[in-house]
């Protein structure tokens, strides 16, 4: 099978948000799950993957240095790469996403100039930063949805942080607004009430400002634009509020998820996720060089890190909702701190496989893969034996 690989000149840059810390995943004694190249193709009647979509968001970082070699400014952003059923739709989404990324360059150039003018040679200088990172939150036949963070640092005690999102109709490639996903514009009021109900439950935890209800109602006013204030996940429709919007900065970004079970009659039927039979397989990782790719009826190829090697992911039966998250370890090596999701796919089976170009270390894994089976969400680290070249998935327990 002829494989087509798009190489992007990019490198994944780890980003940790101080005001919106990810959950800490305790380190575990890794249990190697060896690759099994003997798996033979068959039919995936176990839990057929009718939709075989994938999306990666490889990152790139640009640096600006002073004449004396001091880092003045760094600008981090992403490309997007996807494989879905309709190439024209894929191209349309890609062009829109990249245009949004390109529109941030003017801000980056402005901050870079501020850094040039502010640098005085002091040993206490801290580099200015402008980081924009998206994570795919739902990728399927209904929608392509991503949620991101924007971090700006120009000196001071902490960076300024904001949230952003983009959602596309997976059938047409159209950028979706809130009004475009609801059955009727009046449904904004219904959604507003659902969000307020959720926030009421969170008030004790977040110490929301007095009168926050009015801020939320203004957000959902039918005459106001809320195009970029929502995104989809596999479990619901999410709405978010930036630091200072509803609560003190230390609270970080506040996210409210409305489960799909609360949205019949409100959300357009086209944007509900399909129901599917739970998968019962296990994920298998193997060097693509040692795999017989011809045994797969469908093969998807995407890039995470262009300097890496090709790794093939497939299953003995099938698994669903694969996500790969970049991260780093605490200095004591006890906790893995996830940064952001860099890859998402509907799943793999013994007929459908994914080849990813990625870097896999032999120690201190920095990529975690998760997927869904009938037993729930499974989490593993990627690890490589540099002596044999074998790739293993190490269980996170």
Please state what every model-predicted region is.
Residues 21-293, 343:
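Compositionally biased intrinsically disordered regions enriched in Thr/Gly
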Residues 148-152, 172, 180-182, 241-243, ...:
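A mature extracytoplasmic/lumenal domain signature
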Residues 2-10:
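Sec-dependent signal peptide recognition
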Residues 337-379:
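Short, solvent-exposed, Trp/other aromatic-anchored flexible loops in extracytoplasmic proteins
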Residues 142, 162-164, 235, 307-309, ...:
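Envelope-exposed proteins and targeting segments
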Residues 293-302, 378-397:
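Extracellular beta-sheet/turn segments enriched in Thr/Pro/Gly and aliphatic residues
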Residues 285-333:
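Short, surface-exposed binding/anchoring microloops in extracellular/periplasmic proteins
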Residues 15-19:
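C-terminal motif of bacterial Sec signal peptides marking the signal peptidase cleavage site
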């Amino acid at each position: 099978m002829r494989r087509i690989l798009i190489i992007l000149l990019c490198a994944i840059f780890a980003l940790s948000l101080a005001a919106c810390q990810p959950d800490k995943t305790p380190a575990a004694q890794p249990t190697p799950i060896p690759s099994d190249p003997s798996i033979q193709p068959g039919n995936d009647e176990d839990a057929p993957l009718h939709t075989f979509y994938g999306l990666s968001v490889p990152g790139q970082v640009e640096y600006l240095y002073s004449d004396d070699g001091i880092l003045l400014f760094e600008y981090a952003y992403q490309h997007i790469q996807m494989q879905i059923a309709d190439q024209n739709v894929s191209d349309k989404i890609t062009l829109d996403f990249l245009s949004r990324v390109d529109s941030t360059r003017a801000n980056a150039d402005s901050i870079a100039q501020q850094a040039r003018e502010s640098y005085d040679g002091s040993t206490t200088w801290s580099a200015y930063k402008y980081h924009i990172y998206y994570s795919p939150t739902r990728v399927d036949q209904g929608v392509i949805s991503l949620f991101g963070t924007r971090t700006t640092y120009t000196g001071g005690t902490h960076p300024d942080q904001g949230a952003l999102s983009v959602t596309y109709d997976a059938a047409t490639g159209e950028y979706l607004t809130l009004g475009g996903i609801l059955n009727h514009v009046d449904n904004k009021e219904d959604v507003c009430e659902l969000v307020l109900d959720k926030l009421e439950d969170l008030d004790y935890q977040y110490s929301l400002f007095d009168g926050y209800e009015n801020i939320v109602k203004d957000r959902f006013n039918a005459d106001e634009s809320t195009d970029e204030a929502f995104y989809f996940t596999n479990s619901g429709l999410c709405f978010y509020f930036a630091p200072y919007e509803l609560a003190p900065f230390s609270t970080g970004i506040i996210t409210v998820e409305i489960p799909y079970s609360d949205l019949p009659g409100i959300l357009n039927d086209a944007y509900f996720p399909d129901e599917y039979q739970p998968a019962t397989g296990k994920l298998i990782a193997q060097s693509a060089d040692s795999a017989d790719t011809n045994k797969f009826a469908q093969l998807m190829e995407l890039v995470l890190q262009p300097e890496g090697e090709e790794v093939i992911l497939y299953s003995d039966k099938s698994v669903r909702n694969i996500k790969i998250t970049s991260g780093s370890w605490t200095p004591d090596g006890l906790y893995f701190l996830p940064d952001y999701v860099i890859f998402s796919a509907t799943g793999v089976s013994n007929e459908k496989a994914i080849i990813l170009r990625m870097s896999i270390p032999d120690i201190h894994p920095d990529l975690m893969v998760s997927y869904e089976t009938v037993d729930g969400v499974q989490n593993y680290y990627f690890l490589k034996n540099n002596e044999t070249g074998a790739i293993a998935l190490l269980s996170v327990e």
